[in-house]
């Protein structure tokens, strides 16, 4: 007589459990958070003197350095090629912020164009991705270069009355990028000490997001 009674052996024998290995319980790798890298270019007549003549920017440097996941590196404006080299070494997901005062502001536009001298664009390096650029009264006006879509967003504190022997008053222009121009009216020397501008800059650094990879880098 056939029997169709349920048996424990039949039930348990029909289920195959996956073998467990040490890898099964391996800890998950921590997710790396994108870091914000601020490249701060000082002013100065001869570049090297910017450590003294741009002292007001060191207050901004200190305020930015204490923000979470923010790293600040400061350069003389003549070292702008080093900024290009340092940006090229970053992890692709990190956030790039370039800030420049006076001559450092003008040279920041060179950084954005991959330009370091010679014939442009023939001798230029590939344009770096820049998520945020902030220029404090860039100078001289004739040294400014238009920026392109590799810069996600830029802010220029344009000085209408720099009163500094023809220096200051640089205007930032560009193609296929967002530029916010904030007009100011103060002596060129005092711009670096303007706490209102610094507070705005700090807020922008806190809020900046990464530029996507769809820009036409050249």
Question: PLM features: residue spans?
Answer:
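Active-site catalytic motif of lipid deacylating hydrolases and related acyltransferases
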Residues: 5-16, 22-94, 187
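Lipolytic serine-hydrolase domain surface
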Residues: 42-46, 54-58, 144-218
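Serine-dependent carboxylesterase/thioesterase catalytic core
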Residues: 38, 64, 84-171
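Surface-exposed patches in mature extracellular/periplasmic domains of secreted proteins
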Residues: 70-77, 120-125, 213-217
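Short amphipathic alpha-helical surface micro-motifs
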Residues: 19-23, 136-139
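Hydrophobic, Leu/Ile/Phe/Ala-enriched alpha-helical segments that form helix-helix packing faces
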Residues: 60-68, 87, 115, 119, ...
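Stable alpha-helical elements in mature extracytoplasmic
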Residues: 56, 60, 79, 83, ...
């Amino acid at each position: 007589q056939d029997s169709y009674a349920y048996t424990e052996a039949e039930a348990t024998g029909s289920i195959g459990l996956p073998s467990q290995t040490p890898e099964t319980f391996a800890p998950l790798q921590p997710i790396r958070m994108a870091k914000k890298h601020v490249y701060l270019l000082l002013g100065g007549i001869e570049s090297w003197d910017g450590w003294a003549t741009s002292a007001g920017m060191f207050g901004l440097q200190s305020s930015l350095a204490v923000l979470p996941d923010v790293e600040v590196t400061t350069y003389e404006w003549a070292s702008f090629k080093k900024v290009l080299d340092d940006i090229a070494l970053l992890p692709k997901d990190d956030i790039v912020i370039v800030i420049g005062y006076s001559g450092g502001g003008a040279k920041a536009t060179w950084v954005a164009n991959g330009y370091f001298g010679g014939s442009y664009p023939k001798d230029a390096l590939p344009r770096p991705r820049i998520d945020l650029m902030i220029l404090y009264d860039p100078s001289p006006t004739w040294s400014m270069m238009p920026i392109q879509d590799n810069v996600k967003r830029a802010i220029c504190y344009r000085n209408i009355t720099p009163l500094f022997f023809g220096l200051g008053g640089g205007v930032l222009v560009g193609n296929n990028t967002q530029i916010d121009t904030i007009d100011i009216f103060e002596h060129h020397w005092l711009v670096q000490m303007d706490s209102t501008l610094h507070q705005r800059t700090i807020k922008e650094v806190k809020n900046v997001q990464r530029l996507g990879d769809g820009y036409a880098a050249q």
